[in-house]
A protein has these predicted regions:
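Acidic/glycine-enriched connector segments
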Residues: 2-154
């Protein structure tokens, strides 16, 4: 049996919402059942931050794909996930949205390349209200690459 590499994704609008507590209970239960050996996630609030907290409090190796173009690692200095610079601080929302979707595609692609060493899975939390579409795009990319996805909508 291969160790589990778990991609965490989710709508940041869940953080601070009226359904955050319910979403977090579901998410924590899924994390405990899936028992990841490695966790990877982005750097948004909400489920991404929960993934970091889950991994660090349990001593699980983690990799955080940041909007600055780096992968922060549990075991060393950050490395770049791209040679391109991120948009400037004041750039428009559409440019940043495209950049973050690109980041999420890279994150999923990196995980998919490790299926020879890991049982790669994804756990995702989606908000029932419209957002940027980043979570569903990440889930769709993972599904297209054959990664099983455990997703719930709140």
């Amino acid at each position: 049996m291969l160790p589990t590499l778990l991609i965490v994704t989710g709508a940041r609008r869940i953080e601070g919402s009226s359904y955050e507590a319910e979403a977090r209970v579901w998410w924590t239960a899924r994390m405990l059942v899936l028992a990841p050996d490695v966790v990877i996630y982005g750097d948004a609030s909400g489920p991404d931050a929960w993934g970091h907290e889950f991994a660090t409090t349990r001593g699980i190796p983690w990799f955080r794909y940041t909007k600055r173009g780096t992968i922060e690692r549990h075991d060393g200095a950050p490395v770049r996930w791209t040679d391109q610079p991120p948009p400037a601080h004041g750039d428009n929302r559409a440019l940043w949205g495209a950049w973050l979707l690109h980041r999420d595609r890279i994150m999923v692609r990196h995980a998919a390349k490790r299926t020879d060493r890991y049982d790669v899975k994804l756990v995702g939390l989606m908000a029932s209200t419209p957002g940027t579409g980043g979570t569903i795009a990440t889930v769709n990319r993972a599904t297209a690459l054959g990664i099983p996805c455990d997703v719930e909508v709140f």
